[in-house]
Design a protein with these regions (language model features):
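Terminal interaction module
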Residues: 1, 141-155
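Structural motif
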Residues: 21-22, 50-51, 89-92, 133-135
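Hydrophobic side chains in well-ordered alpha-helices
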Residues: 32-35, 112, 145-149
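Active-site beta-strand/loop microenvironment that shapes enzyme catalytic pockets
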Residues: 74-121
Length: 155
């Protein structure tokens, strides 16, 4: 599974509207909601602060908000990017400063998806995998056997 190691901020401009995507790693719904509220306070003068987050090893918890944009044109496209990229334990807020030109529903969907991708590109993503740490005591003769065993494809 892929997770955000360090968050970032990406920005795009579409027909004079400015879209700022802020990305942060989160571990719980409470942490995601707190981050969304912090970002809304930071960009209090923006027209919209749309959000999406995914939490859980199997992406069990997903939420999104259009924050006043037409239904399914902001939060859901942002969430779709996170799900398609198989990224979890992440929250994204895309802030929109309206530039005076209406984008239409298709334009909004593309803009919010592009902004989310820009935010992810500005973040550091890592592959997280389960593992265990082992402490093995052996003599020098056993070292070669262990190296062979751990070098096998399915261990």
């Amino acid at each position: 599974m892929r997770v955000v190691y360090t968050g970032g901020e990406g920005e795009i401009t579409e027909k004079k509207s400015r879209f700022i995507a802020t990305v942060k790693p989160v571990q719980s719904e409470e942490e995601a909601v707190a981050f969304i509220n912090e970002t809304k306070k930071k960009y209090w003068d923006a027209r919209h602060n749309c959000s999406a987050f995914v939490i859980g090893e199997r992406q069990e918890l997903t939420r999104c908000s259009d924050d006043g944009e037409p239904a399914q044109t902001a939060g859901r496209p942002m969430l779709d990017v996170l799900l398609r990229e198989k990224i979890t334990d992440v929250a994204v807020v895309v802030t929109r400063y309206f530039g005076g030109v209406l984008l239409g529903t298709g334009g909004l969907v593309r803009a919010y998806q592009a902004a989310t991708q820009a935010g992810l590109a500005a973040s550091r993503l890592i592959e997280k995998c389960k593992g265990q740490q082992l402490l093995v005591h052996t003599d020098y003769n056993g070292l070669g056997k262990l190296q062979y065993l751990f070098g096998q494809k399915h261990t």
